[in-house]
C-alpha cells in the first residue's frame, strides 16, 4: 500500500483546516494529521525579550513526534488509520485499497526539511493582512492574544517564516484564501485526483 502525501499550509486563519477537512471528506481512504496537535506544553514554549510566548516557530512544536506519526502511517497505513487517526470516517476506509491519501495541515509544515522531503503536492493559502488580523481577532485562543500581539509578533513571524519557506522549496501552489471555499476545494481536489491517477498508473 502506497501513501500520497498532500501538504496544506498557510498563514494563521487562512482556511487551512477548512480546506483540509473538506478534502478529507471528498477523498476516500484519506486521513489528516494536523500540526497544531503537536504544540509543546505551554511551560516550555520559547519566550521573547518582552515575555511573549513564541508559538509561531518550529521550536514551539514537537516536530520529531509529528514525523514519527507520519512515518508510522507511511510504513503501515492500515494499522495507523485504525488505531490513531481520529478524523478518519469509518465509511471512507477500504482495507484493500492500494493508495492512502495523507493530508498534512499546518502553518509551518513547509519550514521543516524532513517533512518537506515527503510531500507529493504542496498548497499554501494566503489572505491579506487586514483580513488575517480581523479573523484572528474574532477567534478565541488559549491563552488569549495579549494586546498588540498580532502586529508585534504574529504578522512579523509570518513574513519571516514565509521568506524562509520560499528559500527552502519552490514547487508550492499558492491559493487565494478569499476565493469561495467551493472553488478552492474543487481546484485542489481535481489536482490531487490527477496525482492519484498518476501514482496508480505507476503501481500497475
Stretch-by-stretch model annotation:
Residues 19:
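Hydrophobic positions on the alpha1 helix immediately C-terminal to the Walker A/P-loop
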Residues 2-3, 97-99, 138-141, 156-204:
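NTP-dependent small-molecule kinase module
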Residues 11:
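P-loop (Walker A) phosphate-binding loop of NTP-binding proteins
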Residues 50-53, 113-164:
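A glycine- and Lys/Arg-enriched "phosphate-lid" helix/loop adjacent to the NTP-binding pocket
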Residues 16:
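Conserved lysine of the Walker
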Amino acid at each position: 500500500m502506497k501513501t500520497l502525501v498532500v501538504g496544506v499550509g498557510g498563514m494563521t486563519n487562512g482556511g487551512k483546516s477548512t480546506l483540509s477537512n473538506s478534502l478529507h471528506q471528498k477523498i476516500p481512504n484519506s486521513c489528516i494529521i494536523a500540526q497544531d496537535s503537536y504544540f509543546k506544553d505551554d511551560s516550555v514554549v520559547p519566550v521573547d525579550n518582552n515575555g511573549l510566548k513564541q508559538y509561531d516557530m518550529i521550536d514551539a512544536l514537537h516536530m520529531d513526534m509529528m514525523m514519527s506519526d507520519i512515518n508510522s502511517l507511511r510504513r503501515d497505513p492500515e494499522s495507523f488509520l485504525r488505531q490513531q487517526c481520529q478524523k478518519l470516517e469509518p465509511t471512507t476506509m477500504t482495507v484493500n485499497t492500494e493508495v492512502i491519501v495523507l493530508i498534512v495541515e499546518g502553518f509551518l509544515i513547509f519550514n521543516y526539511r524532513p517533512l518537506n522531503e515527503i510531500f507529493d503536492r504542496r498548497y499554501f493559502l494566503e489572505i491579506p493582512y487586514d483580513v488575517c488580523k480581523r479573523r484572528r481577532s474574532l477567534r478565541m485562543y488559549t491563552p488569549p492574544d495579549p494586546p498588540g500581539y498580532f502586529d508585534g509578533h504574529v504578522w512579523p513571524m509570518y513574513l519571516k517564516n514565509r521568506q524562509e519557506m520560499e528559500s527552502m522549496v519552490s514547487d508550492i501552489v499558492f491559493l487565494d484564501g478569499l476565493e469561495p471555499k467551493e472553488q478552492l476545494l474543487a481546484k485542489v481536489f481535481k489536482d490531487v485526483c490527477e496525482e492519484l491517477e498518476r501514482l496508480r498508473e505507476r503501481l500497475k
